[in-house]
Amino acid sequence: MRFFCARCCSFGPEMPAVQLLLLACLVWDVGARTAQLRKANDQSGRCQYTFSVASPNESSCPEQSQAMSVIHNLQRDSSTQRLDLEATKARLSSLESLLHQLTLDQAARPQETQEGLQRELGTLRRERDQLETQTRELETAYSNLLRDKSVLEEEKKRLRQENENLARRLESSSQEVARLRRGQCPQTRDTARAVPPGSREVSTWNLDTLAFQELKSELTEVPASRILKESPSGYLRSGEGDTGCGELVWVGEPLTLRTAETITGKYGVWMRDPKPTYPYTQETTWRIDTVGTDVRQVFEYDLISQFMQGYPSKVHILPRPLESTGAVVYSGSLYFQGAESRTVIRYELNTETVKAEKEIPGAGYHGQFPYSWGGYTDIDLAVDEAGLWVIYSTDEAKGAIVLSKLNPENLELEQTWETNIRKQSVANAFIICGTLYTVSSYTSADATVNFAYDTGTGISKTLTIPFKNRYKYSSMIDYNPLEKKLFAWDNLNMVTYDIKLSKM
């Protein structure tokens, strides 16, 4: 049976569903292979194409209502398919965009990664070069240090041998001088006058003459110009007979030799031995930073240049802590006050052992009778031409300065003097030729040496000798009888003062 699709397959301004119906008709036509196409004008003269296809299944044409139902179903299917197609197109566009982005990322990422790796590699190479440079510099510095150490050891060995030779020659010279004093030296043609044999008076030999100094120079292998020199007080003195003692009349400007590196050096004590013993010399210097509660380190410098540059040759660790700035070095031993005690201790520097301890009877300590600047300066040791002294106060003396002469071997008190100078009214004190001198202020730039107490007469007097506190915090002032100078510690700075003495 044939199915006639003249109405549904006509071309005109119909809906898209009609076109789909036409497509379906064509499909059916292809499937049935019995489609017939016709062309004719309608009543209005409009051209129409019609075709007919035999249904493969239906024996008769359905009703018009059934055809419309089929058309509606086809329209719904067409709309659904169109929506699915649009969704598919949207997904395809999204996939194409994503694929394009992925393609660009894959093209760009290797380049960025490569650039980052190149930068990292460059950084690592620079760091490697820096490390290699630093390594070479450290190796060079280490080699230099080893070489310097070797040179210093050789120099130290040479100096030790030289010191031993000098010590032997000095001993030989001393024996020769003693023999000359006993009158065993034959008289020469240049002798100006006869010398009484056996005379022990220095003035008999007229030691101030140039001839004797030249003779002594040859015996000791020391230039005569070094032995015969003008003392700071302005008169000639020699190594024998004339101690150069007198009354203090002038104190010079401070000369700064060294500045402490840290706050622990705010105040301290430094010194040289006025009576050096082997292996120490006149140049050997000791320094103690006294800020702190457990002060035990004593820095030792073989040469003055080492002291000025801050390179210690040795560091002593004391068996017990010391107190304040009253320590001194004398005849190869360090004398100091034990912390929080009235005990004075003798520490032999060469053997690093304690040789003697002694309590100072009734002496105030740890802030009972300090100098005006404080610092637990109750007990202050001093050295002069006569030997070792201790400056302190007691309850009996009611705060006045007490002065005692000490035996340097066993620290026994040999003699004691009580002054009328209140200890807490003065900033510091030192002893020259058996006379105690005090300083008025530790902060004033224009302080004075304001009192003197002569142990020979037991008389004190006021003075007005100018004394400069250049750095305005003098915590230690000591006299060195060998160098005829004052050593001081002024607010981190280690300084010396030239002095002049009136000839006695």
From Swiss-Prot:
One GO CC term on file: mitochondrial inner membrane
Outcome recorded upon mutating residue 427 to T: In GLC1A; uncertain significance
Outcome, altering residue 57 to S: Loss of higher molecular weight isoform
Keywords per UniProt: Calcium, Cell projection, Cilium, Coiled coil, Cytoplasmic vesicle, Disease variant, Disulfide bond, Endoplasmic reticulum, Extracellular matrix, Glaucoma, Glycoprotein, Golgi apparatus, Lipoprotein, Membrane, Metal-binding, Mitochondrion, Mitochondrion inner membrane, Mitochondrion outer membrane, Palmitate, Secreted, Signal
Domain of life: Eukaryota
Outcome of substituting residue 502 to P: In GLC1A; uncertain significance
Effect recorded for residue 414 to K: In GLC1A; uncertain significance
Consequence recorded when altering residue 360 to N: In GLC1A; uncertain significance
Binding site for Ca(2+): 380, 428-429, 477-478
Occurrences of domain Olfactomedin-like (ranges): 244-503
Annotated segments matching region Disordered: 106-131, 170-200
The keyword Membrane is assigned to this record: yes
Impact when changing residue 227 to G: Reduced processing
Induction notes from the record: Up-regulated by dexamethasone, a glucocorticoid.
Coiled coil: 74-184
Modification note: Different isoforms may arise by post-translational modifications. Glycosylated.
Effect on the protein upon substituting residue 380 to G: In GLC1A; uncertain significance
Summary of the function given for this chain in its UniProt record: Secreted glycoprotein regulating the activation of different signaling pathways in adjacent cells to control different processes including cell adhesion, cell-matrix adhesion, cytoskeleton organization and cell migration. Promotes substrate adhesion, spreading and formation of focal contacts. Negatively regulates cell-matrix adhesion and stress fiber assembly through Rho protein signal transduction. Modulates the organization of actin cytoskeleton by stimulating the formation of stress fibers through interactions with components of Wnt signaling pathways.
Record's disease association: Glaucoma 1, open angle, A: A form of primary open angle glaucoma (POAG). POAG is characterized by a specific pattern of optic nerve and visual field defects. The angle of the anterior chamber of the eye is open, and usually the intraocular pressure is increased. However, glaucoma can occur at any intraocular pressure. The disease is generally asymptomatic until the late stages, by which time significant and irreversible optic nerve damage has already taken place.
Record note on quaternary structure: Homodimer (via N-terminus). Can also form higher oligomers. Interacts with OLFM3, FN1, NRCAM, GLDN and NFASC. Interacts (via N-terminus) with MYL2. Interacts with SFRP1, FRZB, FZD7, FZD10, FZD1 and WIF1; regulates Wnt signaling. Interacts with SNTA1; regulates muscle hypertrophy. Interacts with ERBB2 and ERBB3; activates ERBB2-ERBB3 signaling pathway. Interacts with SNCG; affects its secretion and its aggregation.
Protein name (Swiss-Prot/TrEMBL): Myocilin
Gene name for this UniProt entry: MYOC
